[in-house]
């Protein structure tokens, strides 16, 4: 995706791509409603693409007091099937299973992780298991799967954590250059559902503004669809 242009087509050649270029303007900024409409009209892929958001923040992630990270419960969900693992002691395993966890256990899951068998998208753990999980932190950490109390994945509330993970909880984290990227639902969702997800996500990131940030916090917002167009949002329209 281009950092400076508000329209980018992530493929080359073909009649459909040329048609997509016509449906979005390279010299325009859009509000969220119009942006969603434009992306839908310009989508040409044969699968159901994901609505993606990229936010450029005026922060320096190298400073610990300017890290932006958290989770958002999307009102309309993500449209994806999420596999959840719960690492807990035996007496709470049945509770985790009833809650809907796909993988439940303790040392057996740790052994699978060490063997490279990671068959889950979210890992939840009870606090009393964190010492054991520490042995696989170097494996889970780089994959964004390490349980974290700040993200609600280290908790005594197994039922609530599993429900949140299954119903559309999305994690966000500012990367290099202050960029946040996330998928916020399928393009086939009704417009109003996508707008609810967008507003919930943007609001959460805005509220997560570090106190030490000087100057403009929101620098730019882009929306795109998988293998489709990218449009830039008019920041004044969401202020």
UniProtKB/Swiss-Prot annotation:
Keyword Transmembrane helix: no
CDD domains (UniProt xref): Ribosomal_L1
Organism listed in the record: Rickettsia bellii (strain OSU 85-389)
UniProt GO MF annotations: rRNA binding; structural constituent of ribosome; tRNA binding
Entry's family note: Belongs to the universal ribosomal protein uL1 family.
GO cellular component: large ribosomal subunit
PANTHER family: 54S RIBOSOMAL PROTEIN L1, MITOCHONDRIAL, LARGE RIBOSOMAL SUBUNIT PROTEIN UL1M
GO biological process terms held by the UniProt record: regulation of translation; translation
Protein's UniProt name: Large ribosomal subunit protein uL1
Keyword terms, alphabetized: Repressor, Ribonucleoprotein, Ribosomal protein, RNA-binding, rRNA-binding, Translation regulation, tRNA-binding
Binding partners and assembly: Part of the 50S ribosomal subunit.
Function summary: Binds directly to 23S rRNA. The L1 stalk is quite mobile in the ribosome, and is involved in E site tRNA release.
InterPro entries named among the record's database cross-references: Ribosom_uL1_bac-type (IPR005878), Ribosomal_uL1 (IPR002143), Ribosomal_uL1-like (IPR023674), Ribosomal_uL1/biogenesis (IPR028364), Ribosomal_uL1_3-a/b-sand (IPR016095), Ribosomal_uL1_CS (IPR023673)
């Amino acid at each position: 995706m281009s950092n400076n242009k508000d329209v980018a087509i992530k493929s080359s050649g073909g009649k459909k791509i040329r048609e997509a270029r016509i449906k979005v303007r390279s010299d325009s900024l859009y509000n969220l409603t119009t942006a969603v409409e434009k992306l839908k009209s310009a989508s040409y892929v044969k699968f159901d693409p994901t609505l993606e958001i990229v936010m450029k923040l005026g922060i320096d992630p190298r400073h610990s007091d300017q890290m932006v990270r958290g989770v958002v419960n999307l009102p309309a969900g993500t449209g994806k099937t999420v596999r959840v693992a719960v690492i807990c002691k035996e007496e709470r395993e049945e509770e985790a299973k009833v809650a809907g966890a796909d993988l439940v256990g303790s040392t057996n899951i740790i052994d699978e992780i060490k063997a490279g068998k990671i068959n889950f998208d979210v890992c939840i753990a009870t606090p009393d298991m964190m010492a054991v999980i520490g042995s696989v932190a170097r494996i889970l950490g780089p994959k964004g799967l390490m349980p974290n109390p700040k993200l609600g994945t280290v908790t005594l509330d197994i039922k609530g954590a599993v429900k949140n993970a299954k119903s559309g909880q999305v994690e966000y984290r500012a990367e290099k250059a202050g960029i946040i990227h996330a998928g916020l639902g399928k393009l086939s969702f009704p417009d109003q559902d996508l707008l609810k997800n967008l507003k919930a996500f943007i609001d959460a990131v805005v509220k997560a503004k570090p106190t030490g940030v000087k100057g403009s916090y929101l620098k730019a917002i882009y929306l795109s669809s998988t293998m489709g167009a990218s449009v830039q949002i008019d920041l004044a329209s969401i202020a």
